[in-house]
Amino acid sequence: MNKLVKTLLLVGTHGVAVGGGFALGIYLLPILTAPESPAVEVVRSTADVAQYKGEFRRDLADSDALHWGEGDLFIGPNSIAFEGRLAPGPDYRLYLSPKFIETEADFEANKSEMVQVGHVRTFENFMVAVPESVDPAKFTTAIVWCEAFGQFITAASYQ
């Protein structure tokens, strides 16, 4: 083997290793740094006073093997609780929308009509406080969105 081929092979294999490590780090870092998920009892206490209920499903148009959520969503006057699982990822946000959204294109096109409720920091169950300025009754859909990569994760219609 000549020296050029060896050098190209070395650079190629090391590049793949570095790229794979970087991708694995992006995937694992949110999992490793996530706070403890709220207990099911805490989520269910919100469910008991919820005004609305929805369901995150895996079968939405832009949900895929890396971007999905499934479980029950409970919308109360002061908090939104989720009992279920989300695909792990960085910088998830919970939005409320006046219309059902299930694609990235629709999210971007309608973002001006939505309100960001807060950060989603756990991937099994979550609780998000509803700011006083937000009235969930004025919306119909909750959406989990990855702000860092502009990725649709999941959505639930609740009224």
Regions picked out by a protein language model, each given a short descriptive name:
Residues 1-5:
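N-terminal Lys/Arg-rich, disordered targeting/topogenic segments
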Residues 6-26:
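Hydrophobic membrane-insertion alpha-helices, especially the h-region
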Residues 27-76, 106-112:
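Transition segment at domain starts
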Residues 70-91:
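Short, surface-exposed binding/anchoring microloops in extracellular/periplasmic proteins
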Residues 78, 85-87, 97-100, 147-149:
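Solvent-exposed coil/turn segments that connect beta secondary-structure elements
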Residues 93-95:
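Beta-strand signatures of extracellular beta-sandwich domains
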Residues 104-132:
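An anionic, turn-rich surface loop/hairpin at beta-sheet edges
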Residues 131-157:
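Short, exposed beta-strand-loop hairpins at the edges of beta-sheets
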